[in-house]
Amino acid sequence: MSEIPGDLKFLKSHEWARVESNGRVTVGISDHAQGLLGDLVYVELPGVGDTVQVGNGAAVVESVKAASDVYSPVSGTVVEVNSALSDKPETINEDAYGEGWIFVVEIDDKEQLNDLLDPDDYAELLEDDDH
């Protein structure tokens, strides 16, 4: 498993959020999640302009094993999607915390970020899951 970047926050359902310098939030799934799913074959992206709610499904990733909702870690408006994933969903497998980002949200309430797990808490969650 790859190192968990220190600038990310996480949901217990294995989505990550990175706060960008412009205050927007980039969202993806963790390296752990992509490892559980296996080779991704399809990504259903939200639409730019869509409103997303914290904890609600905003995208779908499908592997040869399963389909899984991607829950939004924050509420707001989708301002960008990673359309490259339509042609290359395996980018998430290859670089979950980088080029494999899924969408960007203009956040409604920055306080929501305080409810997310920091990298250490997320690592602890993964250790607990392994036992």
UniProtKB/Swiss-Prot annotation:
Q: Which cofactor does it need?
A: (R)-lipoate
Q: Where is the Lipoyl-binding domain?
A: 24-106
Q: Any idea which residues bear N6-lipoyllysine here?
A: K65
Under Pfam families, the record lists: GCV_H
Stored SUPFAM superfamilies: Single hybrid motif
Top-level division of the source organism's lineage: Bacteria
Q: Which GO terms describe its cellular component?
A: cytosol; glycine cleavage complex
Q: Does the keyword Nuclease apply?
A: no
Keywords annotated in UniProt: Lipoyl
Q: How is the cofactor bound?
A: Binds 1 lipoyl cofactor covalently.
GO terms, biological process: glycine decarboxylation via glycine cleavage system
Return the CDD domains for the record: GCS_H
Quaternary structure note: The glycine cleavage system is composed of four proteins: P, T, L and H.
Xref: HAMAP family = GcvH (MF_00272)
Q: Which NCBIfam families match?
A: gcvH, PRK01202.1
The protein's job, in short, is: The glycine cleavage system catalyzes the degradation of glycine. The H protein shuttles the methylamine group of glycine from the P protein to the T protein.
Instruction: Tell me the protein family, please.
Output: Belongs to the GcvH family.
Q: Please give the name of this protein.
A: Glycine cleavage system H protein
